[in-house]
């Protein structure tokens, strides 16, 4: 959504196409089409051969955003363990249960929208590539942002079959986009494709409203923050263990946790935080901020942010958001984090999975407020210089234009179609 908006502000015609569910954002929603491959219909197609054969007018009403949103409120699971067979049928494309829905998307793109460039938002949409290329001859890309994490949670035989299908599908795109050098190298090996097929594109954030500034926070409790989706992979348990160590030495310190909590992670969350509830004001769960302003207020309340993931994070958007509000970070030395810390100079790296090392890094920032402020200032300035949405749009438009020119699709104003 941020990417689409930034390109539009630079004069490109960009259409954001929601798939599976309506797009949920904490800023202006740039959605430019109906929902395709609506989640309810995808599931019913998979479960019922009769449903697949129904005419479109009898099914399309279930793609209405309010209906899909209502369905998700009743605990529709997105747990990868339960979605193995459905994932496979999506990746099988026109050979699977979703063939008619995929054909509708392909016709919309190739016959109605007619963009100069198409970018699919994840590997699970790669089952649409074959059909799209029957209706569209321009450059086609797929961006990867952590697809391996989902795939690795699939039970067998679904994991192996899904990986096989993705490897075959993405061979057909002109390139695969990623946000870090780490992920470029990793996914090259994971998908068994030449690294030259992968292209790094800048990750940027919309700085509007991020009005936090580096502050010595003198007189305020030292507050540690965790902001990410609540699940084991994101490492909340690592933060809790480290905070228990740190809080013993500094009883006035606080831990603030924010992020979406799905039903599949409720048991993990309760077990992980059960000892924190006795700390009263020293611990607070903010939930998932309902607005952009609430999210920014969360960041501004912190002395330091840590999201010590167990998995290797491919981009680290929360790092940029914290730094944009003058909050330094302490992160594990894996995934995209070393690149981000090196380029922003806004935080510290610690050995992964080591709560004591994490607590020691917080201790360093607690004891040396000037050093903490130095990291905050450096990160604050460099995010604005190197990771803003305008620069992201400029670089990606330049990248896409080269492919448009090479394909002979020259227009004064390129029309770009990034998927969500």
Residue ranges of predicted features:
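Conserved acidic donor-binding segment of nucleotide-sugar-dependent glycosyltransferases
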Residues: 343-344, 348-355, 364-369
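Nucleotide-activated donor-binding/catalytic signature segment of Leloir-type glycosyltransferases, i.e.
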Residues: 269-293
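Carbohydrate-associated surface elements
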Residues: 182, 204
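A short, well-ordered alpha-helix in the C-terminal region of glycosyltransferases
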Residues: 357, 364, 371-385, 392-398, ...
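Acidic donor-binding loop of glycosyltransferase active sites
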Residues: 300-314, 327
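A conserved catalytic-core segment of Leloir-type glycosyltransferases
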Residues: 16-107
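Conserved donor-binding/catalytic core segment of Leloir-type glycosyltransferases
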Residues: 216-234, 240-247, 256
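Glycosyltransferase donor-sugar binding loop
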Residues: 254-270, 285-288
